[in-house]
């Protein structure tokens, strides 16, 4: 009988491999004071093995925890909690003999062998925790069959016999039909987690006559199996899990060799020497013993590194599996019979897995006596997590192949349901078939839902339903077909297919595909892709992480998406490349830079997303998702819906990458350097129509938190008749209402009669209300003229009588940022007056700057470098009434650094403004057009977290230069708001400050990794060209070192701060 003499100690099984001691203590600590938490870990990998022991101070607390927590979910997995138990006969040195056997059982190590009725699955042993707790290892059957190598059996199977037994005797002694009570396997303190009900071992001391062994190994021998013990005499509750019988007792004869201590030697007791039937199950023993090998016709070359046993499970090798998930297999290069061979002699131990039972046949593989490798590679971590799958190079009959060799869909589904798995590359041929050599994944007319290749390879659906898996590069040929040799996912007529690698999952990683791939549904055509013999990874690439998030995928080949008639709803390029829709529906994915040509077309060679007449298209890279990143696009792109025109983009041969994060949130669209147009019908778009001008409006129109990198062209929005419900500018540029409904983009709004309730500029530009309704988006700098008017050319927000207006960029929401405005801006409500600012014809950025994050939290507002007045009446401002003086800084013609630096975290929480270097017109300079470097460099990481951004060197209106060129903020914005991105440096002349039309080397070289290095370097250190200094300017330095310090006046390196003083700086 079993007793719980340590009721305060609990066994916790079935843990998620990510669960650690802290999580266990936090979860169970609510029931009472915990003395100790012991999580079993693999010695080699130091990863959790899926079970632990928690010792409470009070047995009552332990009992309550076991009652409440058993079966509950912890970190996504149902756990088992029970009190550890101890047998009535506690012994860590002796195992009672099997009753009626005439000899003592010697197999005290964990096995899954032993006689049992075929209706009872094997008991899967697992190593104990070094303290004798074997744990509940049979509760969740291990789904993956184990690959095997031939060779001598492991040394840790049992203690050596004193007399050599004949092979036949040993064969019978380990026969499958044996009915008996398994000997107790104890740990260091006598505890163990469970007791296999059916277990048999070899004789202990002397050879037993063949008849005796035959009786022991026979199927008719009743009896009880000894309990499996931990090293302190305790075990978990009985788990009555039967073991399937072996077909042929002669198929396996173990050579009795000691088990190596290199994995679990840390748990051995120095003075512990096993006696007779004693021995710990996976190397938790005091000393190793060398035993004489015994010949057998099914001998094994290498020691057993897993926890198998005769008959119940084939011995396996490689890193011991992490039960409950995380199994890792070593390479397999042979042929092995994974299922019963109907009495035929095989080269390896027949295995009956607990996954299914079908008339004594293996649920996974049945070879009709033919040699085949198991499905051991497949589904190695099918239900678990963090498994590592080593490469497989053999042939495997993973499904019922009628004697045909086939590798299972195990690769395609190595991490089918789990997370964090890793799938190594597969280079063989694979068939998963249930009948007639066809796959079990779809059992209809011998065809599979997932893969049927007619001899081709298939590794599709690598992380079909799971999350976090990684699909390493696939270099073979793969096909997916459902019926008639055609697949709802992929059919390539011999082409390769690795589509839909993470179709529904999250966080998967799809490595680059270098073969040909096609997807087709019926008639050789797919709802996703058909290329008429062209290469296609179709929606696989276009949608490698279609529904998930955080995936990343690179595409370097040619891809086609077509639905019917060679045309695709996603992409059709007439032989061109297509990698569109990379993360169309997902979130957080990363689309690596695309440098080829891509097209999207739906019908008639035209797509609702993109049609370029041979041009490139990578539009909609993160259309519906959030948080993804679209790396820089350097080709030409077009979007068109019908008649060569798209509701998103039509450029008459121009480039289009609009709508990069149209509906999503948090995505990033890296800088666009081409020309973009959007048009819906008749060459006109509800979003953008520019008559040949460029348009990148509405980049994040409906989403939130996305970023649209700088816009450098002309943009227009029009709906019908050249007019848009959002924008109408009579041919002028418009990027108003960028985040009218979402966050972060730019757009113009015009409602009716060419007038917009938000913006109407009578031909002027408008970028008003950039984040009017959204939250958290960012509006990149606007460099044109903008007006807002509601009726009669006047707007409830801004009217400037021809002046520019970017007022009220985020008046009502929180968290948005409005990038600096460098033109003229006025806010007026009625009669040309503004409730925020009216300057009597003077320039005004009104309260928009002052209120860029007025209502939100944590945002930063970039500085304004024009002349600004905030006044309510008589040219005076309610914010600061200084007689038309500037409220923040006024230097009477002197140069001054704006208070933008002084207020780097003026309104937000924890943000850091990088310092500004140069002379700035941020304050009132007496009307002088003094030189000024923009704050773009000062703000490379101004808004984001951990990102870097390289500078830009071209002519910019970023500072007031009296009509001269100055650098724009484009490079300053490459990763301006995001987190962790890295933008490669640019080499050219930097007009970042006003240099009198002279060229100036950018600071980009000093800052290519400027946040992680912390070096104070200016100029171009790679070329040794320092950045020229202007007379009267403060010393330049590396403002991106994250030191939080500013350079002292003396020009030293880090450590100092600017002094506050009159004329030079407000710090």
UniProtKB/Swiss-Prot annotation:
Q: Identify the residues that the record assigns to the RRM domain, covering every copy.
A: 8-86
List where Polar residues composition bias occurs.
Answer: 600-621, 788-809, 827-849
Molecular function as annotated in GO: mRNA binding; snRNA binding
Provide a GO biological process annotation.
Answer: mRNA splicing, via spliceosome
Q: Which UniProt keywords apply?
A: RNA-binding
A single Pfam family, by name?
RRM_1
- Here the segments flagged for biased composition (Low complexity) are 366-378, 400-416, 453-464, 530-546
Locations of Basic and acidic residues compositional bias? Answer: 285-304, 379-398, 417-450, 547-563, 816-825, 860-895, 995-1023, 1056-1067
Record bears the keyword Thylakoid: no
Q: Where is this region: Disordered?
A: 90-131, 144-175, 267-305, 357-1067
Record's protein name:
RNA-binding motif protein, X-linked-like-3
Q: What is the lineage of its organism?
A: Eukaryota, Metazoa, Chordata, Craniata, Vertebrata
């Amino acid at each position: 009988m079993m007793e719980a003499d340590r009721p305060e100690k609990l066994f916790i099984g079935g843990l998620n491999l990510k669960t650690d001691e802290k999580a266990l203590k936090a979860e169970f600590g609510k029931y009472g004071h915990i003395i100790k938490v012991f999580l079993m870990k693999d010695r080699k990998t130091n990863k959790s093995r899926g079970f632990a022991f928690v010792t409470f101070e009070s047995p009552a607390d332990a009992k309550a925890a076991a009652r409440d927590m058993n079966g509950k979910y912890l970190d996504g997995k149902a756990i088992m909690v029970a009190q550890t138990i101890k047998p009535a006969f506690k012994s860590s040195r002796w195992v009672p003999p099997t009753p009626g056997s005439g000899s003592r059982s010697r197999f005290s190590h964990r096995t899954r062998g032993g006689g049992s009725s075929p209706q009872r699955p094997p008991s899967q042993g697992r190593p104990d925790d070094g303290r004798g707790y074997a744990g509940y290892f049979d509760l969740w059957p291990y789904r993956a069959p184990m690959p095997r190598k031939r060779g001598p059996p492991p040394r840790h199977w049992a203690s050596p016999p004193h007399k050599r037994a004949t092979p036949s005797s040993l064969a019978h002694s380990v026969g499958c039909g044996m009915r008996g009570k398994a000997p107790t396997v104890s740990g260091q303190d006598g505890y163990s987690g469970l007791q296999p009900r059916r277990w048999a071992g070899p004789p202990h001391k002397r050879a037993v006559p063949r008849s005796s062994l035959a009786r022991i190994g026979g199927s008719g021998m009743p009896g009880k199996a000894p309990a499996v013990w931990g090293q302190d005499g305790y075990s978990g509750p009985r788990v009555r899990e039967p073991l399937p019988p072996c077909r042929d007792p002669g198929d396996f004869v173990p050579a009795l060799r000691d088990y190596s201590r290199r994995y679990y030697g840390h748990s051995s007791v120095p003075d512990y020497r096993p006696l007779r039937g004693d021995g710990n199950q996976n190397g938790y023993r005091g000393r190793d013993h060398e035993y004489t090998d015994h010949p057998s016709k099914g001998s094994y070359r290498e020691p057993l590194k897993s926890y198998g046993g005769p008959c119940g499970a084939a011995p396996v090798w490689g890193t011991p599996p992490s039960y409950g998930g995380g199994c890792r297999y070593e390479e397999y290069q042979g042929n092995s019979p994974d299922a019963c061979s109907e009495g035929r002699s095989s080269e390896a131990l027949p295995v009956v897995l607990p996954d299914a039972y079908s008339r004594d046949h293996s649920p996974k593989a049945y070879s009709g006596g033919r040699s085949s490798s198991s499905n051991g590679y497949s589904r190695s971590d099918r239900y678990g997590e963090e498994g590592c799958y080593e490469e497989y190079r053999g042939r495997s009959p993973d499904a019922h192949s009628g004697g045909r060799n086939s590798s299972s869909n195990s690769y395609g589904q190595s991490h089918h349901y789990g997370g964090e798995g890793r799938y190594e590359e597969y280079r063989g041929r694979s068939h998963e078939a249930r009948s007639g050599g066809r796959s079990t994944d779809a059992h209809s007319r011998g065809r599979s839902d997932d893969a049927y290749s007619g001899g081709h390879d298939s590794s599709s659906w690598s992380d079909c339903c799971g999350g976090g898996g990684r699909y390493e590069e696939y270099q073979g040929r793969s096909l997916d077909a459902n019926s008639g040799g055609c697949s709802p996912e992929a059919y390539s007529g011999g082409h390769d297919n690795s589509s839909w690698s993470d179709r529904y999952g999250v966080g998967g990683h799809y490595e680059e595909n270098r073969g040909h791939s096609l997807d087709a549904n019926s008639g050789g055509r797919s709802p996703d892709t058909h290329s008429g013999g062209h290469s296609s990874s179709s929606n696989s690439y276009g949608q490698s992480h279609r529904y998930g998030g955080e995936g990343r995928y690179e595409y370097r080949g040619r891809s086609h998406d077509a639905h019917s008639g060679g045309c695709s709803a996603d992409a059709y390029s007439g032989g061109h490349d297509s990698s569109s829709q990379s993360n169309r529906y997902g979130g957080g994915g990363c689309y690596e830079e695309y440098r080829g040509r891509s097209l999207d077309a739906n019908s008639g060679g035209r797509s609702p997303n993109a049609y370029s007449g041979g041009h490139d298209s990578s539009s909609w890279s993160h259309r519906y998702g959030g948080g993804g990143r679209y790396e820089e696009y350097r080709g030409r792109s077009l979007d068109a819906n019908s008649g060569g025109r798209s509701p998103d983009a039509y450029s008459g041969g121009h480039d289009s990458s609009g709508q990069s994060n149209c509906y999503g949130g948090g995505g990033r669209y890296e800088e666009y350097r081409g020309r973009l147009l959007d048009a819906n019908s008749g060459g006109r778009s509800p979003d953008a129509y520019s008559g040949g001008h460029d348009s990148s409006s509405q980049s994040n129109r409906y989403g939130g938190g996305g970023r649209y990198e700088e816009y450098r062209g002309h943009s227009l929005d029009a709906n019908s008749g050249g007019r848009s419900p959002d924008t109408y500018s009579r041919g002028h540029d418009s990027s108003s209402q960028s985040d009218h409904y979402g966050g972060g983009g730019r757009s113009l709004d015009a409602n009716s009669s060419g007038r917009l309730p938000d913006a109407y500029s009578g031909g002027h530009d408008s970028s008003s209300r950039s984040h009017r309704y959204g939250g958290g988006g960012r509006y990149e700098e606007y460099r044109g003229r903008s007006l807002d008017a509601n009726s009669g050319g006047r707007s409830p927000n801004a009217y400037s009588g021809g002046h520019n207006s970017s007022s009220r960029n985020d008046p009502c929401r929180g968290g948005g940022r409005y990038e600096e405005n460098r033109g003229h801006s006025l806010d007026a409500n009625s009669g040309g007056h503004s409730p925020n600012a009216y300057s009597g014809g003077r320039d005004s950025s009104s309260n928009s700057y002052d209120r860029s994050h007025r209502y939100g939290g944590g945002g930063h507002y970039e500085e304004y470098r024009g002349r600004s007045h905030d006044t309510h009446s008589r040219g005076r401002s309610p914010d600061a009434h200084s007689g038309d003086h500037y409220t923040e800084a006024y230097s009477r013609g002197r140069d001054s650094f704006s208070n933008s630096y002084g207020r780097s975290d003026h309104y937000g929480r924890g943000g850091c403004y990088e310092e500004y270097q140069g002379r700035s017109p941020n304050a009132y300079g007496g009307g002088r057009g003094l030189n000024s470097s923009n704050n773009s460099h000062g703000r490379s990481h101004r808004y984001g977290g951990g990102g870097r951004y390289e500078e830009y060197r071209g002519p910019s209106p970023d500072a007031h230069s009296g009509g001269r060129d100055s650098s724009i903020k484009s490079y300053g914005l490459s990763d301006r708001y995001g987190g962790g991105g890295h933008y490669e440096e640019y080499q050219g002349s930097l007009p970042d400050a006003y240099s009198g039309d002279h060229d100036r080397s950018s600071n980009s070289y000093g800052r290519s990794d400027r946040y992680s290095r912390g070096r104070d370097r200016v100029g171009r250190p790679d070329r040794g060209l320092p950045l020229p200094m202007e007379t009267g300017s403060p010393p330049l330095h590396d403002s991106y070192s994250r030191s939080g310090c500013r350079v002292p006046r003396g020009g030293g390196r880090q450590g100092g701060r600017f002094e506050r003083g009159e004329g030079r700086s407000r710090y």
